[in-house]
């Protein structure tokens, strides 16, 4: 089970809802992924305008836990305003904090992410901050009392996979809250690797919505995350420089 604050989920795949070709493909991809947590940008949908197409009208909101994010925020105050807007609309008070500090790389602003997380915790939100793979920043966020850490594998939407597995492993080793790898996942192999490192979950969007067949990719991601978790729990063999025979040599007779 993936436990985030008071919530428990069977699936360790969290799925973003943006950039799908249409609602039908989106819904089918969500279904086959078996994701229980869906994330979306509050600023990308007018949740108070009944005339606008609305994801919330298409989904069975009782079936999923919706995770609004603060994408578009440039500082802590903007992030808090977006979070309060989501809560006022009747959504869950679980929020993904996303405060971008650089428009080219879309990397998070560490100072504003810390500030926003602290402010939202004081407001009673369940806080999941998107952060870089900075080990010290992850620890400071954890010390604030956030409910999960969401380090990026690589820049958002890049599909580069995990570019710094060492830092990611350090974050996982020191964590006392769930670590959900977020951003940069490009393939099922990337997702499996994140889970093999010991991550508690993976959040992805573009890898599915941008695939040639989003529905098949959603299923592939589901299976790879399950396989990666099983592999982590099973425990991989140690890496060694020299070969070790897999068949015993003792007792074998030599035919001359």
From Swiss-Prot:
Gene that this polypeptide is encoded by: thiG
Chief location bin: cytoplasm
Chloroplast in keyword set: no
Binding positions (1-deoxy-D-xylulose 5-phosphate): 157, 183-184, 205-206
Metabolic or biological pathway, per its Swiss-Prot or TrEMBL entry: Cofactor biosynthesis; thiamine diphosphate biosynthesis
Location relative to the cell: Cytoplasm
Species of the source: Bacillus anthracis
Similarity annotation: Belongs to the ThiG family.
Function, in words: Catalyzes the rearrangement of 1-deoxy-D-xylulose 5-phosphate (DXP) to produce the thiazole phosphate moiety of thiamine. Sulfur is provided by the thiocarboxylate moiety of the carrier protein ThiS. In vitro, sulfur can be provided by H(2)S.
Stretches that traverse the bilayer: none
Molecular function terms from GO: thiazole synthase activity
Record-listed E.C. numbers: 2.8.1.10
GO cellular component, one term: cytoplasm
Subunit structure: Homotetramer. Forms heterodimers with either ThiH or ThiS.
Keywords assigned: Cytoplasm, Schiff base, Thiamine biosynthesis, Transferase
Catalysed reactions, semicolon-separated: [ThiS sulfur-carrier protein]-C-terminal-Gly-aminoethanethioate + 2-iminoacetate + 1-deoxy-D-xylulose 5-phosphate = [ThiS sulfur-carrier protein]-C-terminal Gly-Gly + 2-[(2R,5Z)-2-carboxy-4-methylthiazol-5(2H)-ylidene]ethyl phosphate + 2 H2O + H(+)
Protein name: Thiazole synthase
Lineage of the organism: Bacteria, Bacillati, Bacillota, Bacilli, Bacillales
Active-site residues, Swiss-Prot/TrEMBL: 96 (schiff-base intermediate with dxp)
């Amino acid at each position: 089970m993936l436990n985030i604050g008071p919530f428990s989920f069977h699936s360790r795949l969290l799925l973003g809802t943006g950039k799908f070709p249409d609602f039908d493909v989106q819904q089918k991809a969500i279904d086959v992924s078996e994701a229980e947590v869906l994330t979306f940008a509050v600023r990308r949908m007018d949740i108070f305008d009944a005339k606008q197409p609305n994801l919330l009208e298409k989904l069975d909101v009782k079936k999923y836990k919706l995770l609004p994010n603060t994408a578009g925020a440039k500082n802590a105050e903007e992030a808090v305003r977006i979070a309060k807007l989501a809560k006022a609309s009747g959504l869950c008070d679980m929020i993904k904090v996303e405060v971008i500090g650089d428009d080219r790389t879309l990397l998070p602003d560490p100072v504003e992410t810390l500030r926003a997380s602290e402010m939202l915790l004081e407001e009673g939100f369940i806080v999941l901050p998107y952060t870089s793979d900075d080990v010290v920043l992850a620890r400071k966020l954890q010390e604030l009392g956030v409910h999960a850490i969401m380090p990026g594998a690589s820049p958002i939407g890049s599909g580069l996979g995990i570019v710094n597995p060492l830092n990611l492993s350090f974050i996982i080793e020191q964590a006392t809250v769930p670590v959900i790898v977020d951003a940069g996942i490009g393939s099922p192999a990337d997702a499996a690797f994140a889970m093999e490192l010991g991550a508690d979950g993976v959040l992805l969007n573009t890898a599915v919505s941008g695939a040639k067949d989003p529905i098949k990719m959603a299923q592939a991601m589901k299976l790879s995350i399950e396989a990666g978790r099983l592999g982590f729990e099973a425990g991989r063999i140690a890496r060694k420089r020299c070969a070790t025979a897999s068949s015993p040599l003792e007792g074998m007779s030599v035919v001359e």
